[in-house]
């Protein structure tokens, strides 16, 4: 039997999964980590998480086919080892994950996290049977992956899907990319925390403490129907809906799948989001495009990273001359 490792490097966490060849998770491991600012530590921690997953293989004879890595950066398909110095300046423009090939003796494949979220949904989740859809990940950052005519489309240099840097308000807040009013400045985790802190005086009955506000606290409070948290989520849904309406008018996907941590709040996000999209799309067939949650939960992107290896093996078995013994 063979297994595949998938790694999801978020801005503030690392997740590893060991899957079988049907995308089923055999083992998983998770660690909070300052990925953006500590590349050496992130790589070392990733190896520890991989070792943890491999230690829980169902059989010593389960061989490792390859390792897929999802990164929070555009990835040029022609140069997958390169990372954006704008998004991850501390990484110096390179992932450094060649060390995984050396350490584990198997091929390593790297792609953008939203692309791999889309790939996972296409193979195993809410995108099965849908030839054209968009996957949007809402977390610390905001990104999208696009399946068009049955394939993930990355663009000429790998930057397709950077929906987080679509300007919603050109007079808005300054974004880390240097532009103003990018979508991420309205719906990214930091933006939601700041929004909740700013609105707190208007909601004296809210359970949220401005001194200890986190995105996780906002999500939990929204689930509990805290009025401040519900308002923050509704505001985010409004801005996200503006971007999605533009996406629907432009490329007309059959579905939009929302992933990332904010999906934990359920219809408190999707309800107002759908309303905004309906108001802002001018063709009924476009407005009817299904907007739904990811079916794969918090492990979805890591499963997508593993699926990247499986896709490569099916497309070109010659890339896998040997199967690692580990």
Positions of PLM-derived features:
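ATP-binding/phosphotransfer module of carbohydrate and carboxylate kinases, centering on a glycine-rich
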Residues: 1-63, 102-104, 124, 130, ...
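Phosphate-binding/catalytic loop of phosphoryl-transfer enzymes
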Residues: 7, 57, 63-193, 304, ...
């Amino acid at each position: 039997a063979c297994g595949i490792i998938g790694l999801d490097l978020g801005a503030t966490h690392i997740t590893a999964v060991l899957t079988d060849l049907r995308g089923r998770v055999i083992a998983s491991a998770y660690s909070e980590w300052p990925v953006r600012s500590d590349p050496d530590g992130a790589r070392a921690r990733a190896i520890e998480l991989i070792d943890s997953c491999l230690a829980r293989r169902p059989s010593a004879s389960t061989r490792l086919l390859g390792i897929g890595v999802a990164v929070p950066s555009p990835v040029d398909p022609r140069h997958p080892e390169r990372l954006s110095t704008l998004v991850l300046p501390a990484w110096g423009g390179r992932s450094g994950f060649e060390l995984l090939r050396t350490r584990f003796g198997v091929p390593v494949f790297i792609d953008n996290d939203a692309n791999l979220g889309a790939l996972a949904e296409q193979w195993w989740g809410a995108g099965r049977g849908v030839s054209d859809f968009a996957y949007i990940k809402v977390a610390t950052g905001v990104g999208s992956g696009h399946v068009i005519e049955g394939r993930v489309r990355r663009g000429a240099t790998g930057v397709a899907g950077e929906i987080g840097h679509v300007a919603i308000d050109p007079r808005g807040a300054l974004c880390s990319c240097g532009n103003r009013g990018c979508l991420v400045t309205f719906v990214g985790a930091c933006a939601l925390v700041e929004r909740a802190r700013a609105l707190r005086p208007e909601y004296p009955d809210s359970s949220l403490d401005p001194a200890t506000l986190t995105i996780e606290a906002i999500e939990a409070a929204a689930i509990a129907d805290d009025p401040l948290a519900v308002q923050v989520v509704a505001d985010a849904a409004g801005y996200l809906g503006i971007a999605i309406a533009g996406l629907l008018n432009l490329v007309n996907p059959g579905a939009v799948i929302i992933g990332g941590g904010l999906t934990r709040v359920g219809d408190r996000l999707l309800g107002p989001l759908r309303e905004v999209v309906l108001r802002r799309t001018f063709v009924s067939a476009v407005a009817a495009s299904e907007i739904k949650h990811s079916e794969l939960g918090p492990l979805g992107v890591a499963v997508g990273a593993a699926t990247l290896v499986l896709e490569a093996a099916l497309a070109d078995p010659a890339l896998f001359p040997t199967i690692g013994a580990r």
